[in-house]
Amino acid sequence: MQENISHLDQIAQTDIYLLDQIMKGRYNATDKILDAGCGEGRNMHWFLQNDFEIYGTDINEAAIAQLKSANPDLTAESLPVAPLEKLPFADNYCNHIISSAVLHFAKNTKHFKAMLTEMVRVLKPNGSLFIRMTSDIGIENKVKLISDGVYIIPDGSKRFLLTKTLLTECMQENNLSFLEPFKTVNVDDLRCMSTLVLQKN
């Protein structure tokens, strides 16, 4: 029973769609993984508990400090405070990058593209890029554009939204392809969350 509780603790806060990738064997213990926009590390916990080489970066200094406090074995080099558009990692450094509920805070289309392009730069060829973010897919007629790429969505919040046109454009510009079918969950017509699992070609 205690062992089962321990396993549940490892995955309690992990994005359910990231868990799907974990269970499918997407990630190997020899891979370098980056959680881009990691916050306090909710999606890093399983990897840390299972001895993966995982890195995290976030612009929020307090969140990184909390993550370091909870995981004292992690070095400053593995948890830099940095914006996604200026990642302090070499080209082709990581086998996999995770970005969950981050990109919809882009200020505009240029900012979104800068963050995406920077993640692709750090990703190795044939590496995977996992993205979860809000989109307009399924609620196209219920969102209100207020600035370049930023909308008010039916739940009242302001988000940068991924559109099919933008997705196609970005995939072509960054030489990306789908590893899995594109998925979108409509939450009672209040917001739509899309999941992308992409490969750098």
Residue ranges and their predicted role:
Residues C94, H111, L167:
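Residue-level recognition of oxygen-bearing side chains
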Residues L103, M115, S135:
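Flexible, active-site-proximal loop/turn residues at the rims of small-molecule/cofactor binding pockets
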Residues E85-I97:
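A short acidic, Gly/Pro-enriched loop at the edge of an enzyme's catalytic core
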Residues K113-P125:
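A short glycine-rich, Lys/Arg-flanked "PGG" loop and its adjoining helix->strand segment in the class I
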Residues H96-K110:
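A short SAM/SAH-binding and catalytic strip from SAM-dependent methyltransferases
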Residues M1-T75, P80-E85, S128-N201:
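Class I (Rossmann-like) S-adenosyl-L-methionine-dependent methyltransferase catalytic domain
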Residues E61, T109-K113:
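Non-membrane alpha-helical structural segments and their capping/turn regions in soluble enzymes
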